[in-house]
């Protein structure tokens, strides 16, 4: 007797291609958006290197420090006479550096918000300032007066005045304690080494006004973005042609960022897109759309917070929730529990003496109602139960099982219009699915065999059947075309 | 209570661009409204009892409906509408902006007549009483026509000082008595084409009129409400039972006051007991105010002559006896209602919009009136689940619905800027000089030429598709594949870089596997790509490997061809059998057919063999639909006990199944 034993195992089908990659999943896990609106465009976002990774947002004539966990403003520094630029937090999280449109470079104590230094050596707006991540007392500033200056914090004096750019300097960054890279509107990237007398070491021509340069951690590669393209420069080879050119944006790229593992590059542009590249092959692995043109972007060092600033003053923060690993009971706590007489709830099972062999009882999952019906040969009931509230896969599984045990005809016969219509509706819904169609064809044929023209007795069933026919006609047309296409493919790949 | 009630027709007309044109039929069971769809207006008919949409009819694109009304049953004898127009159901009359009258049959579900008289402009009121149709246009031109033939019986213009009319209201009691409304009310005798009376009633446009005839007093009462007016004026007109309508017998019998501006009126009264009328007024804020016995003024009740004019006035105006409103929660502002109508004197049907859904509710107001506090019944109707579902949808990231935690709303900020710039603009505005104008003209010409050359580019999606393929952007790709215009697909693929073709095919294969129902469109894409970029694809090395995915998916699909075709054949057979049987074909055949077997005494043995082969096909039928053939079977039972047995054997598989089934289910 071929009675099905136990639970019905769901039918397995060939896996469908999954368009969602692991990468997509990861970047989509940045959700829980919080949006703040500022008065004017957000020109810079800088994350503190220190946990909890607060960040400085520069917009209009103020710099705001946002708390990473609360995602709201913690401190506001508004002691600027004109538009502020490039708020930058020192790696220990104690000082903030910012330039402004008058050319003043100011350093603030973040705990008291008092001005520690106000340095007035630039004549034109200072668009970029950065603390040296390798030395606490050094920082750089780049200005529209075409120069980059390296400062000593303790004395407030300019240590090096690096001139060579032929237009505004809009971006600069430290590569090591003595080496810098800067880019400007003259379309060149210049590398500086402060140790030598003639500090300009190397220069590359990007071709378009550069908005942002980003040196990679390895120190051998610099990424520059200007216009709608990103170029990757190899410093070791020192060639004048970029090793890679990425043109995935429709409009100017305004900001670049790296994740802390230095494996992914993020770029944001005026087209409102943030694109994420895998730096091993420079392929876009994910993209995100924002509501406005993006001017600035920051990814927190723990890769939990993605902050994007837009030209309409919108600041969007997306946060990834890290699920804490539930730590298993520490041995210490267990010890304490037992010491205080807390007894574990686990029941003692007699496992026999040493010389006895204990046969463990196999645990069985409980049978579902339709399993029971199937077991007791109530095929029709089993099918009805599944049809009522089962997933399509379960219904298909049931139908296949019925076919195997030879109960399909029994399950399908003796039905009135009310019990037949849901089945026909299911057929109509899924007969076009290539995974199911084979089984469903057999089921449909069986129904037609059993009932034949008697199906016309009920208006409901007749309607359902004629709708089913429409679907089948469509599918016939599709399969016919599929046949044609297979022919085409054979011809091409022969 | 076996009292027949006869509620008046409630309707509402004249709203810009068709929104808000609604009508209940006389029994308040059907509700029609006109909604603005993307390109054309749609007529929707709802069953107000079940609360479901019955039919939706898409009107022709250029037709803009300006008024709508259901057929009314006159109380006087009249010619009926032919069934090819009405479909023996109710009909709906629609007036358009261009002066056309459309007749829609609810049963047939289509427009059955379109009349255009050529003399009418925008129609603001149209009615059908049996075979008599009436229409009035915005200038006050009235046309009476036959619904069956479309022949114009009379047409005339209502003489009036006002430039614009708002509606026409017909009596169901008296033939040829109508009220035309503008700012004023004109009582019109349609037979003599002349207005009997002209009353100055309101300062604004009249939006609703209700009336009732009291036989005992031989008086005709009517109530009038207007836009932006809280007062409902009540009048009575005395009739002299000669069939002619006397002039100058109209009296103002009072006024009803609502708390808000009145949107529409509805009235109901019992035919047997006409004194007990009830009038409902729907106000703009969504409150319904009920006035019981509206015509019975306090003046008459008291029976005394009021001493002063102000006192008289006070007595003439009366407030509502009951207010009903629907709200989301207690104390909230009421839900704005679309329309109301009396089902009977005791219950009121109410319609409102719940986002895109239309919700109906019947209010048994007389029963509820005991629960009223301060004369107000608040019925709490929380938002339906449908809208709460929308809420979960809004969790999807979107800047527009995200919570703003700090800063100012950009929207408000922009407003202030705009005002500033607008002010600045006013100062600078100056007329352009002739030279500037000429320059502008040439510029425009150049732009037009440039546009015409770029049309081909705008019909293709190649830039979007290229970007989507390059950046692996699923949503962008999806937006391309959603396009099912063959021409667009063709141009898009033609403009696509051939090197992207393998990637495109791969993506198409993925989509095809995930969404088998969309195969129609996706296969057009695949076909176009193979044809257009076939030349390049041949050159790609290892193409077989690269397109293995697509190949297997297509092959899998293609392999279903024969079984699907067979199934189609089976379905065709069964469906045509059904059709055949419905046409009565099988019965005729059964009668024509020779008897299956004839019993001859003495030939039993030889007959049995012959009949058994002949019966084989038939017996399976028998077991399936016993009902159809049971008679024949019964008749044959007595005659052929042997054959009966054989039948059983033949249909073993069926009957066997049945018995097994029965035993198991027990």
Swiss-Prot record, chain A:
Q: Which GO terms describe its molecular function?
A: snoRNA binding
Q: Which domain of life is it from?
A: Eukaryota
Q: Which is a Pfam family this sequence falls into?
A: WD40
Q: Which SMART domains match?
A: WD40
Q: Keyword set for this entry?
A: Nucleus, Repeat, Ribonucleoprotein, Ribosome biogenesis, rRNA processing, Transcription, WD repeat
> Record's InterPro entries?
G-protein_beta_WD-40_rep, U3_snoRNA-assocProt_15_C, WD40/YVTN_repeat-like_dom_sf, WD40_repeat_CS, WD40_repeat_dom_sf, WD40_rpt
Establish whether keyword rRNA processing is in the entry.
yes
Q: What does the function comment of this entry state?
A: Involved in nucleolar processing of pre-18S ribosomal RNA. Required for optimal pre-ribosomal RNA transcription by RNA polymerase I together with a subset of U3 proteins required for transcription (t-UTPs).
The cross-references to PANTHER family, in alphabetical order and at most eight, read:
U3 SMALL NUCLEOLAR RNA-ASSOCIATED PROTEIN 15 HOMOLOG, UTP15 U3 SMALL NUCLEOLAR RNA-ASSOCIATED PROTEIN 15 FAMILY MEMBER
State the protein's name.
U3 small nucleolar RNA-associated protein 15
Q: Species name for this entry?
A: Schizosaccharomyces pombe (strain 972 / ATCC 24843)
What is the gene called?
A: utp15
From Swiss-Prot, chain B:
Show the SUPFAM superfamilies listed in the entry: WD40 repeat-like
GO MF terms here are: snoRNA binding
Task: State where the protein is found.
Answer: Nucleus, Nucleolus
InterPro entries xrefs: SSU_processome_Utp12 (IPR007148), U3_snoRNA-assoc_WDR (IPR052414), WD40/YVTN_repeat-like_dom_sf (IPR015943), WD40_repeat_dom_sf (IPR036322)
Q: Which UniProt keywords apply?
A: Nucleus, Repeat, Ribonucleoprotein, Ribosome biogenesis, rRNA processing, Transcription, WD repeat
Query: GO cellular-component terms in the record?
Result: cytosol; nucleolus; nucleus; small-subunit processome; t-UTP complex
Reported function? Involved in nucleolar processing of pre-18S ribosomal RNA. Required for optimal pre-ribosomal RNA transcription by RNA polymerase I together with a subset of U3 proteins required for transcription (t-UTPs).
Q: Which PANTHER family match?
A: WD REPEAT-CONTAINING PROTEIN 43
For this entry, the protein name equals U3 small nucleolar RNA-associated protein 5
Q: Which organism is it from?
A: Schizosaccharomyces pombe (strain 972 / ATCC 24843)
The gene coding this protein: utp5
